[in-house]
């Protein structure tokens, strides 16, 4: 076997191994993705237009005329433009922690959220259980976010919270 042939064979084998490793990592990440929190009607963020949380003073109701699928659920939008913004970069607009209560995640739990108890912090949408919990969370946003980020990797694979219930 010539040295050139051996080098090409080794390169092909190495590239094949890298491709296999990347594929395994990708599918493992997808398989471990958490379930999106949805309300009793199966809608994320209560059927509101998630882009409007970033662009309007208050969230706008979504419409069945403008929808997109992401993270296994149908998202509703007030306009085709907002739908298109979302589909171009859903991770930019989808709420943190798959729409679960940010305060609860900081306390190592997955709890439902209220679509009107929210805040955008540094370009990220955070939902909370209720306006009262939202106020508590806002007293120490940096501290709660630090704890949430540390807790989320263990919580994410768990099933989504039920639409009714919670521990508050």
Language model feature labels by segment:
Residues 69-82:
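Beta-strand cores of secreted/periplasmic/IMS beta-sandwich domains, seen most often
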Residues 82-84, 134:
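Primarily extracytoplasmic ectodomains and periplasmic/lumenal surface modules that are beta-strand-rich
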Residues 12-28:
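Bacterial N-terminal signal peptides
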Residues 3-5, 18, 167-168:
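Short, aromatic- and cysteine-enriched interfacial helices/patches
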Residues 1-11:
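N-terminal secretory signal peptides that target proteins for export/translocation
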Residues 27-71, 91-168:
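Intrinsically disordered, low-complexity terminal tails and linkers in eukaryotic proteins, enriched
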């Amino acid at each position: 076997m010539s040295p050139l042939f051996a080098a090409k064979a080794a390169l092909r084998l190495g590239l094949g191994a890298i491709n296999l490793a990347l594929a395994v990592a990708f599918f493992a990440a997808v398989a471990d993705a958490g379930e999106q929190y949805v309300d009793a009607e199966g809608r994320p963020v209560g059927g509101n237009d998630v882009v409007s949380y970033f662009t309007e003073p208050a969230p706008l109701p979504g419409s069945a005329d403008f929808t997109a699928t992401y993270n296994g659920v149908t998202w509703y939008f007030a306009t085709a433009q907002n739908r298109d913004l979302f589909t171009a970069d859903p991770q930019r607009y989808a709420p943190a922690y798959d729409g679960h209560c940010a305060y609860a995640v900081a306390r190592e739990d997955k709890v439902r959220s209220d679509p009107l108890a929210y805040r955008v912090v540094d370009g990220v949408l955070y939902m909370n259980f209720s306006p009262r919990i939202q106020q508590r969370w806002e007293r120490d946003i940096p501290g709660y976010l630090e704890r949430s980020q540390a807790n989320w990797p263990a919580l994410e694979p768990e099933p989504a919270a039920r639409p009714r219930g919670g521990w508050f």
